[in-house]
């Protein structure tokens, strides 16, 4: 605005915004939306003090007082300055239930009905055989954004459990897409390429976030002191001892931390796509309090990293999974993927192509969180396991009157396609049961190659801790899905202004800043001007999959007796 980034425009904030809209408690910037403020960090500290003392500089003590007033006032209103009025924990059941009611109502109001052929929704579940298919039908799907509220664990439920409790054996569940898999057996692991011994080398080393940014094998920390683990399956009393040295040094990516590290080779007896998963348990806030952890101690950019060299001839490892992210100021992402394991563990993994009988180099690490012992396992889902899960789901769909197929998307992503084998699963379920309803849990637009083959599509987004109840409310008609799309759903990514190949200055095609990217670091270039969102589609005459503002409902209405 006026040639300035808005969050740096003092005239706008203090003279216009605060003066005319009567903001008396300060303005909160969106988390990580202040990239240009960060770039000005060199003006703080001693340089700011020197500027205040220098009469030639336009900075005064009054300006400093103005800047810190709102921050200190907020702390004071919550009793944090004198520590006399802090809200005691844990939160009581009354407050929890009040919040739960609001969360359920909002999730239901946000539901968007994208398709409802033959008015298959709402459903009278009485007497119907229903097959619930997909991990999202059994587990609450949660987002992985940096400020995602994960809610109370004891409030989370699933559509399958709710239906089963009410309608009994008529309701069945099939995973369809097996993300958990099984712990990789020792006879598929080798400490070195030419070894006949089974297992992986485990050692303790110092690791930074950038250590394997390029997957360069030469920078993997080496040590002569190691043990060979037959399987990587540590939990409960078998958990690995806590690593406490180096864990209290502040949040710096460049500061090495102590990690447990595993290195060796993986060999499958099947050819095809395998899901390799680094699974670990998040200790929870109880450990945070028990071990007297301070915000300044939360120094883990990522708790675990899983790398594999997919092709024997390839020079670099590629990252298949990223663990829990923990940083300072209480920011914790306990889940790195939107669907956790059945037992609640984080499930960081990815799909890789393996050929039977070939050995693939694998490296992964994990550090301790909140100074607790490490519970971790290395698992996989082989092609035969994937096929069995899909066949079981198809068979369940054949035996049912209605198939509820839950799908998820790892938003925000560089692609619109559903992850893993979900598109294939939906296609096969829809072919087996003409009455297939797809329920989506995602945060952005997704491709729907199966759109014409299913009866209904219900967009439930990431609906929070009460999401299962809210989804049930919409499915059985207790709530009318009155939500409308807040964004345009394109047919393909290149339809979006940000991904238009004619304008490479807008987006880093590699997904990260590099010398090959046209976009400068921390910069978004809106060369389309005001033609953003739906205006871009109108201007370019692009037919979207679903337009901005789209949404059906259960209400029936008509116009009659019209006169001009």
What are these regions (language model features)?
Residues 18-32, 69-77:
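Conserved short secondary-structure transition element at the edge of the structured enzyme core
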Residues 3, 27, 35, 59, ...:
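Short aromatic/hydrophobic-glycine micro-motifs
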Residues 65, 69, 97-104:
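An alpha-helix initiation/capping motif
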Residues 41-45, 52-83, 91:
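Long, well-ordered, tryptophan-enriched scaffold segments
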Residues 84-99:
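Flexible, acidic loop-helix segments that line cofactor/substrate-binding pockets
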Residues 1-21, 25, 43, 49-55, ...:
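C-terminal non-catalytic regions of proteins with extracellular/luminal or membrane-system context
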Residues 26-44:
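Mobile "lid/hinge" segments at catalytic clefts and subdomain interfaces of large enzymes
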